[in-house]
Amino acid sequence: MKLLDKLKKEKKEEPKIIKKQGEEQKFSFRDALGNLKSAMLGKAADIREEYKNRTDHAMQSDEMQDLSVRLRLHKNKVRIRTAAILTVLLAVSVGFGIYHHVRVYHHYVLVSSEERAGDNATQYIFLKKGCTLKCNPNGVTCVNRENAVQWNTTFTMQNPVIDVCGTTVAVADQRGNDVYIFNEKGLVGNFKVEYTLTRIRVARQGVVAAVLEDGDVAWINVYDSKGNIIVKNKTSIGKAGYPLDMDISSDGLKMVVSFAGIQNKTLDSKVDFYNFSSVGKDQDNNLVKEISYDGTVIPEVRFMDSDYAIAFRDDGATIFCGKHVPEEKREITIEKEIVSTFYDESYFGIITENEQEENEHKYKMELYRENGSKCFQAYFDMEYTNIKICGEEIFLYNGTELMIYTTSGKLKYHAAYEKQISEVIPSDGLGKYVIITPDSVDIIKIG
């Protein structure tokens, strides 16, 4: 019975178990559908999120690109604006330069004036900016741009003559015996020569060449700054001729002398070159070159620098060049009468009377470089008593009138001055000049 009851019980429970299994299978299918739906919904959400992220990224990228474009446009605008400003500034600068170049000034403003009563014998030597020497028979004084005394040396001379090379100055008593050497810092040396001094030249390091007279004998000697004789050259005026002029190179190693004499009742001139280095030590009196010129006079000879020299003839100029033994390199022939010559270490000029029918001006000025190539020629009418070149400017003046040319040939300034002009010196500052008059030292600014 128990067994039968157990079987009946199991038989009754079996459909329940099957029903539960059927119910479990139904639940799993729904769950699967639910899971699939959830998965699809989740995927769609993920897709929407991804799309949103990509859209946001694209929007951010567009914003970055837009910002980059705006920055680039701003930079371009800045560049264009800067270029425009620079172009305007350049145009203004070029225009001012052209205006300044072509304009001729006829007016001046008096900047300052200082009295110099009783000082008419003083000569002014402009050495460099901020250093001017005042030389008279009683000594030499150096003043700065404010005219304050930097140093002074006293002496007594009857007729002081001056030669300048760079910032080295030789002051000698013409027809006397005293020689003083200065630079911008003060006295370098002084000594006495044994015969009557007629000419003196100085090199940068203080070496001095002097022409001395002793009856019918001329001595052309070279000294160091302390008076020690480097070369002693005795010449006979009757044989060699009279030394018209001489110069020493800036390095003190070469000397050029112009002689004039009469040979067979004919005027004879010659130019002698001396070398005091090892090149000329084995030559008689260190003479390394001699050139004769018949029928002409050579009143001036100059070293432009250590290698170039020029001989001013009465009918032109001859340019020499050579490191040790100068040779003739170029000859300039002037057909008209030479009125004046001027020079510095870089340029030399010749002024002649002008007789050209097509040009009615009275004078013709020609400027040349040290090698003889021409810089310019210009014509003018002003009567002048002094001419000199200083830096890149040429000064012509008389007692009441001043004219300034540039070395490019431009007339820069031409006007009368209210006082008598004794000397003109460049000053510090654009367009400023020192005008020395008999009773004042004036600083003017042209404009």
Where are the predicted features?
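Aromatic (tryptophan-biased) beta-strands that constitute blades/sheets of beta-rich domains
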Residues: 103-122, 144-157, 187-193, 231-233, ...
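Short beta-strand elements that form the blades of beta-propeller/WD-repeat-like
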Residues: 123-136, 140-141, 162-174, 179-180, ...
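N-terminal targeting leaders characterized by basic, low-complexity, disordered sequences
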Residues: 1-58
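Intrinsically disordered, low-complexity segments enriched in Gly and acidic/Ser/Thr residues
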Residues: 323-417
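Repeated scaffold domains used in trafficking and secretory/extracellular systems
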Residues: 116-127, 155-167, 195-206, 239-248, ...
